[in-house]
Amino acid sequence: MPTFKGPVTVLDGRTLWFGTLGNGYKVRLAGIDTCELPQWALNPKWTNRDKQQAPTPVPCGPFAKAWLKRTVGNRPTTCVGLAYANDGIPVAQCTTNGVDLAAEMLRVGWARLDSPYINAQYYAYQTNAMAARYGMWGTYVLDMNEWRRKAVDKTLDRHPIADFNLLAERKSEISPPFADARNKPKRTDR
């Protein structure tokens, strides 16, 4: 498997572009999945139902991309290839300044585990993010694979009400239950 090194452009919350290598290479972060760029999540604190037709939208795809972009900055990135995805894109373990990018995305709550082989550290980061309601774990969000199957309009002009309607007919939900939504987070270190 190839190793990629150099400056990157962040395409979305899990995909990097090494534009200076050959004709350019897309590389996907191993072990995680994030919202697609046009995907919306919804704020569970929907109190004024008489005035507001749907909960406040949260652009989870752009937020995931922004966090990854902030983490990478303009520092060089190293990705060690592990496999190829079904679409032929290399899946790799990527680091910037010694920071594991997939672990960072899980730690801040803008990614979820997406691998049959669970890394114990990744699992701990995701569990802590869920408990503290970081990132997408503080919203109602449709499972990414289900969103990819059901969403008809996948353009960046997509309206949040479309994802509100998809959530109403969801088969699986990755959002944690909000019975304890009024409780303070277990962690306060962020």
Regions found by a protein language model. Name each.
Residues L29, M105, A129, S175-P176:
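Bulky hydrophobic/aromatic "packing anchor" residues in well-ordered structure
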